[in-house]
């Protein structure tokens, strides 16, 4: 975003907030500014606030709330002491039931505005655990010389800075309550300036921390990590380089996995693998997707962007055959191992870059009844344009970005003869503005 070069006038102003933006900020049009839009962090629709400008650009301004003069009835006191500074979650001031209402509204607005489509039915919002749900994430680590301390946390609203966290209530408690201990541990290390980030991931029986370090750890620092792991019940992995450089420090064998009891499936994973962040919502989402797909015992299903087999293996318990395709060869290898470990011989997996031409791929010509896809934020348009879509009776699309879903929905409905039967939001990331959603398409 191009910002003006003039010195920013930070004089607070009073304004009425009319809407909530897709990223969770209040929207106002300032009098005396020609109706120019201002996005205000910490403000809610229907409120009268005092706001301090933080940035100006040609088309809109940005500000932060410094006082609430007339509060929305939906405003609540944020649980977290770092709300308003940390960017980890920006909706804690909005009553929980209204957060998902706002996300449904963002989804429908995107479908209509970008895709020019409207679902025949709006699915009830899917919700799971609201606190202590985040089982995977990345903390930034920074040694701040001016403060003479090490900070561990998520980025601040101003992403140049790392939030100095004392606790995080959205992260699983075993990690969220130990952030100050992590910061103190690193502060006492020889290589405290050489650790830029810590990744965390939790299975059902183990929690792992992966330490990215730019220089080899001293023996003293290695032992400090081992002692910390033993005292607090963590597995520690070291990452001196890229993803392939990750190796266990302690213990040497770590049983990282999660179970899906409804499907009698267990999925093993590695410390940097992608898994769904919210365990309780993930189980509901899988059941939701399988039901919406109307999967039947004689069906052959194609599962694109399948990862470890999060949807593929439960589907294998229901249908005749399922084929999973994923761009990450490591995840495909783990998916195959998971299928074998769970005794599922009707699940096949292929590694393929789904943004590239796959029309000659063997899996493309196998013939399927139904399609399930769970693409990254960029969506699935490249592969949708290659698929023999006329062969699919039904498509279930799980999305982590409403904009790309809307674009792809427009393609399916307006160009390929599908009906958008239903769509709805799923609250994978409570208290954040992130919108996870699911949509169902049927051939007309």
From Swiss-Prot:
Function field: Catalyzes the formation of 5-methyl-uridine at position 1939 (m5U1939) in 23S rRNA.
CDD domains linked: AdoMet_MTases
Keywords in alphabetical order: 4Fe-4S, Iron, Iron-sulfur, Metal-binding, Methyltransferase, rRNA processing, S-adenosyl-L-methionine, Transferase
GO MF terms, alphabetically ordered: 4 iron, 4 sulfur cluster binding; iron ion binding; RNA binding; rRNA (uridine-C5-)-methyltransferase activity
Catalytic activity, reaction form: uridine(1939) in 23S rRNA + S-adenosyl-L-methionine = 5-methyluridine(1939) in 23S rRNA + S-adenosyl-L-homocysteine + H(+)
Protein name: 23S rRNA (uracil(1939)-C(5))-methyltransferase RlmD
Annotated positions binding S-adenosyl-L-methionine: 276, 305, 310, 326, 353, 374
Annotated source species: Xanthomonas axonopodis pv. citri (strain 306)
Catalytic class of the enzyme: transferase
GO biological process terms held by the UniProt record: rRNA base methylation
Family to which this protein belongs: Belongs to the class I-like SAM-binding methyltransferase superfamily. RNA M5U methyltransferase family. RlmD subfamily.
InterPro entries noted in UniProt: 23S_rRNA_MeTrfase_RlmD, MeTrfase_TrmA_AS, MeTrfase_TrmA_CS, NA-bd_OB-fold, SAM-dependent_MTases_sf, TRAM_dom, U5_MeTrfase_fam
Binding-site residues, [4Fe-4S] cluster: 80, 86, 89, 168
Catalytic site positions: 400
All copies of domain TRAM, residue ranges: 5-67
UniProt-listed NCBIfam families: PRK13168.1 (NF009639), rumA (TIGR00479)
PROSITE patterns noted in UniProt: SAM_MT_RNA_M5U, TRAM, TRMA_1, TRMA_2
Enzyme Commission code(s) on record: 2.1.1.190
Alphabetized Gene3D superfamilies for the sequence: 2.40.50.1070, Nucleic acid-binding proteins, Vaccinia Virus protein VP39
